[in-house]
Amino acid sequence: MAGAKEIRSKIASVQNTQKITKAMEMVAASKMRKSQDRMAASRPYAETMRKVIGHLAHGNLEYKHPYLEDRDVKRVGYLVVSTDRGLCGGLNINLFKKLLAEMKTWTDKSVQCDLAMIGSKGVSFFNSVGGNVVAQVTGMGDNPSLSELIGPVKVMLQAYDEGRLDKLYIVSNKFINTMSQVPTISQLLPLPASDDDDLKHKSWDYLYEPDPKALLDTLLRRYVESQVYQGVVENLASEQAARMVAMKAATDNGGSLIKELQLVYNKARQASITQELTEIVSGAAAV
């Protein structure tokens, strides 16, 4: 059994670590609330854009934009949103596993996959497993802006415009609540039709000013940008929630470990006292 001094040192070490994890839990909780506010502020715009685009997909358009037309699939692209930092449980790896499973279904059909990464964890993971990373952006911090995301989005849209991509998806974690974050893969292009049953039984038509091409070119790019930005802010809220839960679990585990070490320390101290008493009694008997 380890000596009492060594056990006391271990207890002190765990207590110091526990203070750090508790502080990180509190910081993550504060950042999560701010991330939720940003997510709530941008969500109505993203959802409204999705509805408008859903209407367009069902509409009888006088100008058929390339983003509305299905193609034979030879290559697909994924905009993958991950975190820049770790210590957030299985948030990233669960997302990567889901993406790898989907990519396998494409490669089994001889379809190639391109990846545009947002977040350093995704970059390092897919570089290590041999993914075809064609664009990346990292280090956006806790308050990302759309201008920082334009690079990877522009690369993938250009590839789609030039016919080098036939489908485009966004991969991110959807924030449900503090305890639940769901990895999701959503199709961006070609434009997915709305799931609203009312729209499926209506024939939509529009009048465009100044002209359909100019309006749709701008609107559809804004749609893609809005969905990517919403994916990033939801993933950020998911990251802070997962980190808060992970740090709370670490703090609780530290408390359990301290109790176990305290019990071992008490036993070691009791054994030491018993040994000293035995030696005293033995010495007295010898005299």
Curated annotation (Swiss-Prot):
InterPro entries: ATP_synth_F1_ATPase_gsu (IPR035968), ATP_synth_F1_gsu (IPR000131), ATP_synth_F1_gsu_CS (IPR023632). It is a peripheral membrane protein. The keyword Repressor does not apply. Keywords: ATP synthesis, Cell inner membrane, Cell membrane, CF(1), Hydrogen ion transport, Ion transport, Membrane, Transport. GO terms for biological process: proton motive force-driven plasma membrane ATP synthesis. It comes from the Bacteria. It is found in: Cell inner membrane. It holds the Pfam family ATP-synt. Gene3D superfamilies: 3.40.1380.10, ATP synthase, gamma subunit, helix hairpin domain (1.10.287.80). One of its GO terms (molecular function) is ATP binding. CDD domains: F1-ATPase_gamma (cd12151). GO terms for cellular component: plasma membrane; proton-transporting ATP synthase complex. F-type ATPases have 2 components, CF(1) - the catalytic core - and CF(0) - the membrane proton channel. CF(1) has five subunits: alpha(3), beta(3), gamma(1), delta(1), epsilon(1). CF(0) has three main subunits: a, b and c. Belongs to the ATPase gamma chain family. PANTHER family: ATP SYNTHASE GAMMA CHAIN, ATP SYNTHASE SUBUNIT GAMMA, MITOCHONDRIAL. Produces ATP from ADP in the presence of a proton gradient across the membrane. The gamma chain is believed to be important in regulating ATPase activity and the flow of protons through the CF(0) complex. This is ATP synthase gamma chain.
